[in-house]
UniProtKB/Swiss-Prot annotation:
Bias-annotated ranges (Low complexity): 85-103, 368-404
GN (gene name): DDI1
Subcellular location: Cytoplasm
Annotated family: Belongs to the DDI1 family.
Pfam name, any one: ubiquitin
Keyword vocabulary terms for this entry: Aspartyl protease, Cytoplasm, Hydrolase, Protease, Protein transport, Transport
Gene Ontology CC entries for this record: cytoplasm
Keyword Protease: yes
Subunit relationships: Binds ubiquitin and polyubiquitinated proteins.
Protein's name according to its UniProt entry: DNA damage-inducible protein 1
Domain spans labelled Ubiquitin-like: 1-84
E.C. number: 3.4.23.-
Gene Ontology terms, MF aspect: aspartic-type endopeptidase activity
């Protein structure tokens, strides 16, 4: 049978492209085919890169029949001498004229056309490259643009590598300098860290996704709250603003006040010994520790989960409590404060222009890099932001209601033992009637 080879020569003195027709047989090995090509073109087998159906042929022991080559097929042959240009007779004849040129400008270590053909023939490789370098994938159909982008990427890596080597050489000038050796160790460590990061993004990219917390919609005293389920918390916690909104702030036992110590410290106002909480269709008694400094309204801790033998089923994305399955809230229903905290977290630069969150490990695309930088600058002074965010649930309903009722009416209800917000809620429920509002407060 007869096959045709489309030869692309990347050597400076070779033809750009030529066609070669060869008489072969199915039992011919790739090694024999390379020898036949060398006899016809003088190209050494090590410089021959054969492609069949877009796939680079690596195994010289395989036959043409095993590769599926049939009569009339066309194979691509890309010529690039990995050993340099001094082995072929043509290069040897031109050595006096071109000896200075290869020395001044050595050939690149990787041929863009070979890389481009490999990516075109491997859908998996194309998908992986699309996640890290979408600009290269977009230029696959344009060889010149791909070669330009690929060369720019190699030049950038080469400059960074040369700069690191230069720093190491400067530091090695005095091998007995302890500080210089410590800096060399740090440079090498950073290289290993970036290599580990690159391997993780390539082989285990799912670890860089954003993990959403587990929230349930519950009710306390008729007030709906989005509670965070945290099996690592010892007690069930509620913010003072949420306790005000639920109308149980008056039940806080301040003898249980103190300081909570863990990752940080928080002020414990007191404890509500018993209040009714609705989880799904269940009405359950629950105790709450009222604590400041939390950016969540309520946190269901281990005391509540163990008391009712609750089970967190991540496969079903549900909380199973006393045989009842209660679904967790979806990402769109999670409180805005939590998502804003993720957006405000500081980032570190990642490969290919991406940024990675320091706490969540989430990878952000290069297009979001400009938006992440402003969020990182105010971070050192943004520590009180969670308290300000947590204060909004109580301040939002209070602001529009204050002008609606006379101040003396609110003060009368507060004198009965109700909180200011509970007094406003009672006035809203009774249309501003102080007597009816007082009776509602007494019913509490």
């Amino acid at each position: 049978m007869r096959i045709t080879l489309s030869i692309t020569n990347s050597e400076p003195q070779g033809d750009d492209q030529e066609l070669l027709s060869l008489e072969v047989y199915p039992e011919m090995t790739i090694e024999t085919l390379r020898s036949s090509i060398q006899a016809e073109t003088t190209h050494h087998p090590s410089a021959q890169h054969l492609y069949h159906n877009g796939q680079l042929v690596h195994d010289n022991a395989k036959t043409l029949g095993e590769l599926g080559v049939t009569d009339g097929d066309m194979l691509a042959l890309h010529i690039r001498d990995m050993r340099g240009s001094t082995t072929t007779p043509a290069a040897a004849r031109a050595a006096p004229q071109s000896a200075a040129r290869p020395a001044a400008r050595p050939p690149p270590a990787q041929d863009p056309e070979v890389i481009r053909l490999q990516i075109l023939g491997d859908p998996n490789l194309r998908g992986e490259l699309g996640r890290s370098r979408p600009d290269l994938v977009a230029a696959l159909e344009d060889p010149q643009r791909f070669a330009r982008l690929f060369a720019d990427s190699l030049d950038r890596e080469r400059r960074e590598r040369n700069e690191r080597q230069r720093q190491i050489q400067l530091l090695n000038a005095d091998p007995f300098d302890i500080d210089a050796q410590a800096r060399i160790e740090e440079i090498i460590r950073q290289e290993r860290v970036m290599e580990n990061l690159q391997n993780a993004m390539e082989h285990n990219p799912e670890v860089f996704g954003t993990v959403h917390m587990l929230y349930l919609e519950v009710e306390v005293n008729g007030y709906k709250v989005k509670a965070l389920v945290d099996s690592g918390a010892q007690a069930t916690i509620m913010s003072p603003q949420c306790a005000e909104a639920c109308g149980i702030m008056r039940l806080v036992d301040k003898r249980f006040s103190g300081i909570a110590r863990g990752v940080g410290t928080a002020n414990i106002i007191g404890r509500v010994h018993s209040a009714q909480i609705k989880i799904g269709p269940l009405f359950l008694p629950c105790s709450f520790t009222v604590m400041e400094g939390k950016q969540v309204e309520m946190l269901l801790g281990l005391d509540m989960l163990k008391r009712y033998q609750a089970s967190i089923d991540l496969a079903k994305d549900k909380l199973i409590i006393q045989g009842v399955e209660v679904p967790f809230l979806g990402p769109a229903d999670i409180p805005v404060e939590t998502e804003e905290a993720v957006e405000r977290e500081p980032t570190v630069p990642g490969p290919a222009g991406t940024t990675i969150g320091q706490r969540s490990g989430a990878v952000h695309a290069p297009s979001g890099q400009s938006g992440a930088a402003p969020a990182q600058r105010p971070q050192p002074g943004a520590t009180p932001a969670p308290a300000a965010v947590a204060a909004t649930p109580s301040s939002q309903p209070r602001a529009p209601a204050a002008p609606s009722f006379p101040r003396e009416h609110i003060d009368q209800l507060v004198a009965l033992g109700a909180s200011e917000q509970r007094a406003i809620q009672a006035l809203e429920a009774t249309g501003g009637n102080v007597e009816y509002a007082a009776s509602l407060i007494f019913q509490d």
